[in-house]
From Swiss-Prot:
Annotated keywords: Cobalamin biosynthesis, Glutamine amidotransferase
Annotated PANTHER family: COBYRIC ACID SYNTHASE, DETHIOBIOTIN SYNTHETASE
Active-site residue list: C329, H426
Free-text function comment from the UniProt entry: Catalyzes amidations at positions B, D, E, and G on adenosylcobyrinic A,C-diamide. NH(2) groups are provided by glutamine, and one molecule of ATP is hydrogenolyzed for each amidation.
GO annotation terms (biological process): cobalamin biosynthetic process
Pathway: Cofactor biosynthesis; adenosylcobalamin biosynthesis
Chain ranges of the GATase cobBQ-type domain: 248-434
Keyword flag Disulfide bond: no
HAMAP family: CobQ (MF_00028)
Pfam family, one: GATase_3
GO terms of molecular function: ABC-type vitamin B12 transporter activity; catalytic activity
Protein name, as recorded: Cobyric acid synthase
Keyword hit for Nucleotide-binding: no
Length: 483
């Protein structure tokens, strides 16, 4: 069955977005389609139906394709836990930590896993849409490449090259990328897509004509810059603020070096009654109604950084004045008395003092907990759904059950004064009733209902509309083998 790959001239060129759009576009035409990313490097991950983890972008693409996320959609996931190393996840399961040089030698094994997953998807679906990583023209990464042209050559698939015109230099990006590829790789590029264009397309046409003449390859279309568009970012935290009313609930998130699953905060950013502020290194925590300690890939190191910034003192002051504090996953572990890492899973083996705001201790264990869960929040008995991705096992009387899970377990805890709440569950704010209950707990009255999952579905539909309106659908159908 056909495979079509999308590669980008740079990171954040629009690869994830275009694959998401094409998945829904193909599904509209009655095609059984699956997303695929050979290798992903990201700290945002999702739990799959088969009990593993993949990049969140592939989970969103699965939604666009009408599928449950599966580990075959992202067979190699790298989760950085230091400047030189990462946790390596193969077929949804962590196999250990590797330094960059060690992983380079491991790539043939990783490539075998990639090809196994791709073969299974090809057997099950009529079309596989593949997302590359970064740029295919990184000279230092070409040897042993499994994420871009190395994969395309191995499975003999055509490639669409996408570039972001909003950043400037789009023609240099496209032509320069093409020039740095080998002749066989150049032949795989079947066309270009220009992303995030604003203005009069007539003014761009001379450049498009030149590009086609210079390269001998067609421009498949120009996608517009979309406003009010909110699919999750794959990597960097989006710290842009949106102006809200003076009565908005003030929510502050300290940005720690190894913050993970920052997509947890996207629903807060979109809520019209919430002013979300990310605080970075060297910045003071401003007055707030709610402070949220996020997930972390290196909890002890991030907790040390939190203290270096003086944010622990700011949190204590915030609580003295009646503010609320929420810890999610690694943030929950920080709320306890001790964090023990006897196996050195996140750095040097040892223990660290927690913030001591809830009475429990955490031990980091090699076996990671991966679950999609449902249950009831202790606040208003609101229905909640989410997912667990953590290596820690937490025990102690302070874990009195912030969430009662449908599988019979309890999760997290709430302090006796009701000011501090901790949970292992990511995705807390995606369920409307739990979202509203948490906002009321934090001090917001007359809460407007926001259904983040419905907003995501709306934006996926909008993306598919853009493909139908602005790309050469006949050429796309030919590349996808759709008759």
């Amino acid at each position: 069955m056909p495979t079509l790959m999308v590669q980008g001239t740079t990171s954040d060129a629009g690869k994830s977005t275009l694959v998401t759009a094409l998945c829904r576009w193909a599904r509209r035409q009655g095609v059984s389609v699956a997303p695929f990313k050979p290798q992903n490097m990201a700290l945002n991950s999702a739990v799959t139906a088969d009990g593993g983890e993949i990049g969140r972008a592939q989970a969103v693409q699965a939604q666009a394709a009408g599928l449950a996320p599966h580990t075959d959609m992202n067979p190699v996931l790298l989760k950085p836990n230091s400047d030189m190393g990462a946790q390596v996840i193969i077929h949804g399961r962590a196999i250990g930590n590797m330094q960059a040089l060690t992983y380079h030698g491991y790539k043939p094994v990783a490539m075998a896993a990639v090809l196994e997953s791709h073969a299974r998807l090809v057997e099950r679906h009529q079309l596989v849409l593949v997302e590359g990583a970064g740029s295919p023209a990184e000279i230092n990464l070409r040897a042993g490449d499994i994420a871009n042209m190395g994969f395309a050559e191995a499975v003999d698939c055509p490639v669409i090259l996408i570039a972001d015109i909003d950043k400037g230099g789009v023609f240099a990006h496209l032509v320069g990328t093409l020039e740095l590829l080998s002749p066989s790789e150049q032949a795989r590029i079947r066309g270009f897509v220009i992303n995030r264009f604003r203005g009069d397309i007539a003014l761009l046409k001379p450049g498009l004509d030149w590009l086609e003449q210079r390269t001998g390859k067609p421009v498949l279309g120009v996608l517009p810059y979309l406003t009010d568009f909110h699919l999750e970012a794959e990597d960097a935290v989006d710290t842009r603020q949106q102006a809200k009313s003076a009565q908005a609930l003030r929510v502050v998130v300290p940005v720690l070096p190894r913050i993970s699953n920052h997509t947890d905060f996207d629903p807060l950013r979109l809520h019209p009654q919430v002013q979300l502020t990310f605080v970075g290194p060297g910045q003071a925590i401003p007055p707030a109604d709610l402070i949220i300690l996020p997930g972390s890939k290196s909890v002890r190191a991030d907790l040390a950084r939190l203290r270096e910034q003086g944010w622990d003192t700011a949190i204590a002051r915030h609580l003295r004045y009646g503010g609320k504090l929420l810890g999610i996953c690694g943030g929950l572990q920080m709320l306890g008395r001790q964090i023990h890492d006897p196996h050195g899973l996140e750095g040097a083996a040892g223990s660290s003092e927690g913030l001591g705001l809830l009475d429990f201790e955490t031990v980091l264990e090699p076996e990671k907990q991966l679950r999609n869960v449902r249950g009831q929040l202790c606040l208003e008995q609101a229905q909640v759904s989410g997912y667990e991705i953590h290596a820690g096992v937490s025990r102690g009387p302070g874990l009195n059950g912030a969430v009662q899970l449908d599988d019979g377990r309890s999760d997290g805890g709430l302090s006796a004064d009701g000011q501090v709440l901790g949970t292992y569950l990511h995705g807390l704010f995606e369920q409307p009733s739990a979202f509203a209950a948490l906002l009321r707990w934090a001090g917001l009255h007359e809460v407007q209902t926001v259904d983040y999952q419905a907003l995501r579905e709306r934006d996926i539909e909008r993306l598919a509309d853009q493909v139908e309106l602005h790309l050469d659908n006949e050429q796309l159908r030919m590349l996808c083998g759709i008759r």
